[in-house]
Amino acid sequence: MKKSTLKPTCKYPLDLFDRYEFRSYGHAMEILADAFPEEWGEIENALKKFTITTAELRKAGGNETAIPKKFDAVLYPLKWEEIKITGDLHVKLYPRAGKKGTFSKEPFKEIPIKRWIDGHNIDFIKNRVAFDLEWNSKDQTFDRDLLAMRTYFDCGIIDVGIIVTRAEELNDIFKSLKLMGKYGASTTWMGKLVPRLDSRRNGGCPILAIGIRK
């Protein structure tokens, strides 16, 4: 999947690039800007409003602190919804009918596989855009997020996903505040997300990865 590290243009406001790192996989940014301008505009507005204080950085907790909830306050009133999906797989086996390559119109066996898709949830979905924030969870959370977005994409529910997390340069602030023990290398940040995207764990789903800069 093609990846690009984005640079500011007239389409993508300069003030966002001053505050965030952007990496686009599968032309995710172009899809958002051209096909979903309303949804992207709401995300853009949420990113512009987003701020963090040193007091919030010091507060105990991971992804349930006040920091991630700032996106809740902006997006949920705009009809972004948390959604979970499940799905059953119904497999039909058709016997050969006559010559090779022709098959009966009726299956001779049917195999139902319950909960083939089981409980994938995404924090924010609107129209065909998915959005998730991973501030300070275990880095394996990215595997869950990417599998969920890939599954929603394969099922025809979404066309593009967005994941926001910490950029590497925030480590300078964490070190100055003596917080590196809390925001360690095994938590969610761009250094853990990008290799997963480079190895295509998102499947065919276009993903815009956004890193919060200092």
Where in the sequence are the language-model features?
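Domain-level recognition of nuclease-like catalytic cores that cleave nucleotide substrates
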Residues: 167-214
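Catalytic core segments in nucleotide and nucleic-acid processing enzymes
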Residues: 135, 139, 144-161, 178, ...
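Glycine-rich active-site/cofactor-binding loop and its immediate structural neighborhood
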Residues: 130-133
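Hydrophobic, Leu/Ile/Phe/Ala-enriched alpha-helical segments that form helix-helix packing faces
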Residues: 67, 71-79, 152-153, 190-200
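Nuclease-adjacent, charged terminal/linker segments that flank catalytic cores
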Residues: 1-88
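Class I S-adenosyl-L-methionine-dependent methyltransferase catalytic core
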Residues: 58, 62, 116, 157-162, ...
